[in-house]
Regions:
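A short, sequence-level motif marking secondary-structure junctions
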Residues: 59-61, 231-236
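Acidic, low-complexity, intrinsically disordered interaction modules
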Residues: 237-249
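Short amphipathic, helix-prone segments within low-complexity/disordered or flexible regions
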Residues: 216, 220, 224-226, 231, ...
Length: 252
């Protein structure tokens, strides 16, 4: 049995990506239902506050995510969402019979912005919670962030650089995110060590598009209209050749 906890950003900055997020999550969920083994799924949506839409449901019973649950609003209370979920799952495991505690627990956290609205938890408290669960119970935590330095932000609350990745927060990037998440979940559910290159496809997507942007900027700059000083320089450089260019005879 695997405990899966998804903590998904639905703050206002995610506007325009609702359909992509819903589609990506549902596609991942359907893929996981076809894999061997049982899993319990919890899904927490966060903005100003956290909303638990799936509380330890058997994987096969997880309904599709819809626009009724996933709509964007508010700010980014990331720490409250993460801290609250760890506290909830930790307490259940603490008081459950030993044989009822899942062998593996995995948290997947996605956000497109920095923490800016938590009231109950701070970085230090969440960091201590995460480090304790990793060291004592071998919980896995993945952090996928857009428009931020994901590795630096993850480190602030105890998630290593090898478990964090920057992604492009658009239609293509969001779809790829959930494909990669699904692959990582499959590894953990199968009791395989999570490969160091679990995030390779996301890294490659980001790098490829950054190169494309740089190339586009280069050509845009190269073909931009020359300034007066540039034009003067060009005229000076070609002036020695001008004498060699035949001219029409003047009219007398």
């Amino acid at each position: 049995m695997t405990e899966l906890v998804f903590i998904l950003d639905r703050s206002g900055s995610m506007a325009g990506l609702e359909a992509d997020t819903i589609g990506g999550f549902n596609s991942m969920s359907e893929k996981q239902k076809k894999e061997a083994g049982e899993a319990l799924v919890s899904t927490v949506l966060f903005a100003n506050d956290s909303t638990v839409i799936h509380d330890r449901l058997l994987l096969g019973e997880v309904p599709p995510l819809t626009e009724k649950e996933y709509f964007t609003c508010g700010c980014t209370a990331l720490l409250d969402a993460v801290g609250g979920a760890i506290h909830h799952i930790g307490n259940i495991h603490k008081y459950a019979r030993r044989e009822d505690v899942p062998e593996k627990t995995m948290f997947i956290i996605t956000t497109d912005g920095y923490e800016n609205a938590s009231r109950r938890y701070d970085y230090e408290r969440v960091r201590r919670m995460i480090e304790r669960q990793k060291e004592k119970y071998c919980w896995e935590f993945l952090f996928l962030g857009a428009n931020i330095d994901a590795a630096k932000e993850a480190a602030r609350f105890g998630v290593g650089a090898d478990r964090s990745v920057n992604y492009k927060c658009d239609e293509v990037g969001t779809a790829l995110n959930y494909e990669v998440i699904s692959e990582a979940v499959c590894s953990v559910r199968a009791a395989r060590p999570l490969s160091a290159d679990w995030k390779r496809r996301i890294d490659e997507d980001v790098q490829k598009r950054e190169v494309s942007v740089c190339t586009a900027r280069f050509w845009a700059t190269s073909w931009a209209a020359p300034t007066s000083s540039t034009a003067t320089t060009i005229r000076r450089r070609i002036s020695p050749c001008s004498a060699a260019v035949p001219t029409s005879p003047t009219t007398r």
